[in-house]
Swiss-Prot record:
GO terms for biological process: alkaloid biosynthetic process. This is Sarpagan bridge enzyme. The lineage of its organism: Eukaryota, Viridiplantae, Streptophyta, Embryophyta, Tracheophyta. The gene is SBE. The strictosidine aglycone-producing AJM7-DeltaHYS yeast strain expressing pathway genes of the VOM module, RsGS, SBE (GsSBE, RsSBE1 or RsSBE2), RsPNAE, RsVS and RsVH, accumulates vomilenine. Additionnal expression of pathway genes of the AJM module, RsVR, RsDHVR, AAE (RsAAE1 or RsAAE2) and RsNNMT, leads to the production of ajmaline. Ajmaline is an anti-arrhythmic alkaloid commercially used as an efficient drug for the treatment of arrhythmic heart disorder. GO terms for molecular function: heme binding; iron ion binding; monooxygenase activity; oxidoreductase activity, acting on paired donors, with incorporation or reduction of molecular oxygen. Pathway: Alkaloid biosynthesis; ajmaline biosynthesis. It is found in: Endoplasmic reticulum membrane. Monooxygenase involved in the biosynthesis of ajmaline-type monoterpenoid indole alkaloids (MIAs) natural products, important plant-derived pharmaceuticals used in the therapy of heart disorders. Converts by cyclization the strictosidine-derived geissoschizine to the sarpagan alkaloid polyneuridine aldehyde, precursor of vomilenine, an intermediate chemical in the biosynthesis of ajmaline. Converts by aromatization the tetrahydro-beta-carboline alkaloids tetrahydroalstonine and ajmalicine to the corresponding beta-carboline alkaloids alstonine and serpentine, respectively. It comes from Gelsemium sempervirens (Carolina jasmine). PROSITE patterns: CYTOCHROME_P450.
Length: 501
């Protein structure tokens, strides 16, 4: 008698069950979602996000479907907002409802279970951390206290450029990153840091991983996926390296504190955080642990370098493309400084430089798609139901190119901000490169001061020309952790105002 053989495939069964799971989720979606393009089975609209410049693609879709859209990215239900008006509705009027962040593997592993202020879940710990940032870490007084470090490091950068100013093209981004990493390391963990170079290399490796849109984050129910793609192993390896560096830094500082009788060790961010840790008591509602300190310090270094370097590189690019604006900027800083060394305190006198920075943030925001928020509860907006757990993504790049907000939005025109009340504090939703509402970046003042000092110093001391054979500067973008130049900016510096010792 023949025995019937049953052909059984575990992968096929897995795919079938997963398909049913996704189908049930789609059937349970509210019927009055915002409009959007058709969704494919399982992947939804992922194929429309898989482009070199997703912020451009999303703007094109918004032109067709409107300033509020619903897209499906794998398992993630996403609401895309492309207007200043609706950004204010969500981030302002419904700020509490969208105060959370999606839980991501990169933030969980690399930032000690999302213990930094950017990705920490909304709650008592996050509120306490925001207060620490506002009062202790990045208050205006704290930023002013960093001015000596910034001035010293900018002087070192300018001298390096001046010593190499022999007609050879310079990769401007690298010089700015050297300045920013040095400044952020000194303000965060002190001037003497064993392992600082390794920390910098680790930060670069992590930013490279987080630059891409991770498919693993869009299918959270597929727990095995990060192991298949190798992401979990890669993050684990980097996390182990990072933790060893930061543990050594903290141990070294605590040892110094034990033998110190003064408070010099509390003048940088690490010193302040360790002081807060020592003040923990049984009555303290939220305690600062070593892992929290490591997450905060590393997040500050990572966030404070990449975006500022990208912004100033775009500033120089636009000024080279627009020689009239370059002349105005250089004339201003050279007339104000009159041959003297430029310092952090001097940037407040440079109105046109600030206008250039604002215009660059409008046209080339470091985060064209603001970090996603996650809805903590269902909300009603414009007659649509926004489901709980939906991601809210503001396409700020589209807001910056909105012809209803900006006259001739494709034109680089810093003068549009002359005598304008619009600033980047989060109150004017047409200009929110640092976000808005409860989750606005707490480092606005520090980042803006660094950008202004960098740009003013570079165009004050040097004239810049294109390398031989380059007739026109390209402005192609590369989307990743931020929006940077696809081809790094190479310029030849010519010393005009020599750097003084």
């Amino acid at each position: 008698m023949e025995v019937m053989q049953l052909s059984f495939s575990y992968p096929a069964l897995f795919l079938f069950v997963f398909f049913l799971f996704m189908l049930v989720k789609q059937l349970r979606r509210p019927k009055n979602l915002p409009p959007g393009p058709n969704k494919l089975p399982i992947i939804g609209n992922l194929h429309q996000l898989a482009t070199e410049l997703p912020h451009h693609t999303l703007k094109q879709l918004a032109d067709k479907y409107g300033p509020i859209m619903h897209l499906q990215f794998g398992e993630v239900s996403a609401i895309i907002v492309s207007s200043a008006k609706l950004a204010k509705v969500f981030l302002g009027n419904h700020g509490l409802a969208v105060a959370d962040r999606p839980k991501t593997m990169v933030a969980t592993i690399m930032l000690y279970n999302s213990s930094g202020v950017t990705f920490a879940p909304y709650g008592d710990y996050w509120k306490h951390l925001r207060q620490v940032y506002a009062v202790e870490l990045l208050s205006p007084k704290s930023v002013r206290s960093f001015s000596m470090i910034m001035d010293e490091e900018i002087s070192l950068m300018l001298k390096r450029i001046q010593s190499n100013a022999a007609g050879q093209p310079l990769k401007v981004h690298d010089e700015m990153m050297t300045y920013l990493f040095a400044t952020l390391c000194r303000t965060s963990i002190g001037s003497v840091c064993k392992g600082r170079d390794l920390l910098i290399d680790t930060a670069k490796d992590i930013s490279a991983i987080s630059a891409a849109i991770r498919i693993e984050e869009l299918f959270p129910s597929l727990k095995i996926l990060p192991y298949i793609t190798g992401l979990h192993r890669q993050l684990g390896k980097l996390s182990k390296r990072l933790d060893g560096i930061l543990e050594d830094i903290i141990a070294q500082r605590e040892k110094m504190q034990e033998s110190s009788t003064g408070d010099n060790d509390e003048r940088d961010i690490l010193g302040v955080l360790l002081k807060l840790k020592r003040s923990n008591s049984n009555d303290t509602k939220v305690r600062i642990r070593n892992d929290d300190i490591k997450a905060i310090v590393f997040e500050l270094i990572l966030a404070g370098t990449l975006s500022t370097a990208a912004t100033v590189e775009w500033c120089l690019s636009e000024l080279k493309k627009n020689p009239g604006a370059m002349k105005k900027a250089q004339d201003e800083v050279r007339q104000v400084m009159k041959g003297e060394t430029i310092c952090t305190n001097d940037v407040q006198k440079l109105e046109y430089i600030r206008m250039v920075i604002k215009e660059t943030f409008r046209m080339h925001p470091p985060a064209p798609l603001l970090f996603p928020r996650e809805c903590r509860e269902p909300i009603q907006v414009e007659g649509y139901t926004i489901p709980e757990k939906s991601w809210l993504i503001v396409n700020y790049w589209a807001v910056g190119r909105d012809p209803e907000l900006w006259n001739d939005p494709e034109k680089f025109e810093p003068e549009r901000f002359r005598n304008s009340p619009v600033d980047m504090s989060g109150n004017h939703y047409e200009l929110i490169p640092f976000g808005a509402g409860r989750r606005i970046c707490p480092g606005i003042s520090f980042a803006a001061t660094n950008a202004e000092l960098l740009l003013a110093s570079l165009i004050y001391h040097f004239d810049w020309k294109l390398p031989a054979g380059v007739k026109e500067l390209d402005m192609d973008e590369l989307f990743g952790a931020g929006c940077v130049r696809k081809n790094p900016l190479h310029l030849i510096p010519k010393t005009v105002v020599p750097c003084q010792d």
